[in-house]
Amino acid sequence: MRPLLLLALLGWLLLAEAKGDAKPEDNLLVLTVATKETEGFRRFKRSAQFFNYKIQALGLGEDWNVEKGTSAGGGQKVRLLKKALEKHADKEDLVILFADSYDVLFASGPRELLKKFRQARSQVVFSAEELIYPDRRLETKYPVVSDGKRFLGSGGFIGYAPNLSKLVAEWEGQDSDSDQLFYTKIFLDPEKREQINITLDHRCRIFQNLDGALDEVVLKFEMGHVRARNLAYDTLPVLIHGNGPTKLQLNYLGNYIPRFWTFETGCTVCDEGLRSLKGIGDEALPTVLVGVFIEQPTPFVSLFFQRLLRLHYPQKHMRLFIHNHEQHHKAQVEEFLAQHGSEYQSVKLVGPEVRMANADARNMGADLCRQDRSCTYYFSVDADVALTEPNSLRLLIQQNKNVIAPLMTRHGRLWSNFWGALSADGYYARSEDYVDIVQGRRVGVWNVPYISNIYLIKGSALRGELQSSDLFHHSKLDPDMAFCANIRQQDVFMFLTNRHTLGHLLSLDSYRTTHLHNDLWEVFSNPEDWKEKYIHQNYTKALAGKLVETPCPDVYWFPIFTEVACDELVEEMEHFGQWSLGNNKDNRIQGGYENVPTIDIHMNQIGFEREWHKFLLEYIAPMTEKLYPGYYTRAQFDLAFVVRYKPDEQPSLMPHHDASTFTINIALNRVGVDYEGGGCRFLRYNCSIRAPRKGWTLMHPGRLTHYHEGLPTTRGTRYIAVSFVDP
């Protein structure tokens, strides 16, 4: 008998051990309803997969039988749940979690969920809300709660399969009926509540409904993990539900929870689902329609088009739609198209003479892509975007989002092209992470409620969820806000990436159109673009000491201006036209007497004195301190002007000392092309510079040592820009 007894005992132990190996979560099933795979559903699945939940989606492929945006509905969810529970009704150990999916995400795993469910000591636990819905008349029938939320929420509940089967057994309603009202009436019936054994998650230990509780919920960063913390009850909910107006807050939380972004790891999902373009030849690249919008007077439009041309994307796979609202920019647009329009697959221009409204033009651009099935992407770019990264388009395509914008900010400011949150009336509100995203302390791909100025939209999205031909009208909102409101209404996510610096936004606040070349005045508002357009590309080499010549003792020669800077400064002066007479009487200067007169126009005559001083401070002062060690300058000046030399007007300049500590003399046109002769001779050293280079400046000491003269111009017209610095 003993051997048989031992075998029986061993078998019992093995069976017990096998049961002990079974994980509690093996008896957990998550049911949800999703009639189509929206971005919200994919987010729900991703958070569930992170914690290894078993999920079954009900209703995929069905029509949703309630009109979007209506307050009632949800009966379809009850119908689908009732049918799904038929095969589980007798599984007493099976725990079923039922939750919405489009606006829900998991913050913790099955083990914690089941632990908290069992601690509730009820067979069915519903989420609880601060607000009663849909029938406020039922408020008095609710049991009084001393601590916690009082009202039932149908967006999430958990229970044993037999009890849930009893819960939905009486459902005979229509798909358009309210599921919340159905469950509420069962809960408010004391007999049914006791029979099914229902309670509410009053303190949000399992479920967190954001509606009516936005101020209670904050992010809690743990080591390598992010939770939502309820401050009112000091709880860490397992599921977060953000229905209705709180979806935007769920989107914000979903940028982090459960571990999509942490301080330790950064973005953990930014490289998921990418569309790689590596190794793809030009012929196989997707077709992109580029929409360009010039809606107001904008600086550096010519530079905008140059940057467009520098994109590393074949023009034969790009189509252009340009809406130019401004007569002021008509010549620049036409010049660009005349020179480069034929390089693109197609071009459509809507000019200022058409007088098309901003929203209508943007609708037209999007619709051109929508109606053409070969249009894979629509790339909308406003003219105030400085797209400085040539790989911008490829990088955005690579992220593989329906709608995505790159972060763009204004120079030195927190102003950007996205909002991290919206106020109650739908306007700007600053999210907790806004500054960190703008300043690059948090880097990733962010789900945000508002983008503008530049974005990439998939053509398939325009032909699908965004198929409305009027995306840019919504109530009385401006086109940018209307666009975002319409996208949010379709439950399409708008993403913002700050993984790469693709460019910046121009400041338009102080832009004026009263000059011939208005960009010259933008050195304060848009210094980066001013530098790109007007400062010589080799200036940085000169600053590093690699491109500085010394043609005469203590005379330095280095590049400073671009060809464009030289041309525009000359044209601006000629456009102004009030050249001095070149005699000693000069009312423009203190005392009214000029000892060494030239035919010139002063910078202050064209309102350019502040801008010129900024130029001297930013670009001349650093060179001075390098070339004359120990001397530091604030680049003060009394005289800064453009001189014109002509054989029949004033061909040369008599020997003189400059009234300065040092002088700069910038050649504004080309010897041998625009004029002959000219140059500068330093008499004490018997040293002449006879072939000044356009855009290069001479820098030399002024009074005392460098006695010099202007050599005769024998043909054409010579222009130079001169400053007497630190007089």
UniProtKB/Swiss-Prot annotation:
Instruction: Read off the SUPFAM superfamilies from this record.
Output: Nucleotide-diphospho-sugar transferases
Topological type in the membrane: Peripheral membrane protein
PROSITE patterns linked to this entry: FE2OG_OXY, LYS_HYDROXYLASE
Q: What is the effect of changing H708S?
A: Loss of enzyme activity
- In the UniProt record, which residues carry a glycan? N163, N197, N538, N686
Every Fe2OG dioxygenase domain range: 636-727
Catalysed conversion reaction: L-lysyl-[collagen] + 2-oxoglutarate + O2 = (5R)-5-hydroxy-L-lysyl-[collagen] + succinate + CO2
Linked disorder reads: Ehlers-Danlos syndrome, kyphoscoliotic type, 1: A form of Ehlers-Danlos syndrome, a group of connective tissue disorders characterized by skin hyperextensibility, articular hypermobility, and tissue fragility. EDSKSCL1 is an autosomal recessive form characterized by severe muscle hypotonia at birth, generalized joint laxity, scoliosis at birth, and scleral fragility and rupture of the ocular globe.
Q: What is this protein called?
A: Procollagen-lysine,2-oxoglutarate 5-dioxygenase 1
Q: What is the lineage of its organism?
A: Eukaryota, Metazoa, Chordata, Craniata, Vertebrata
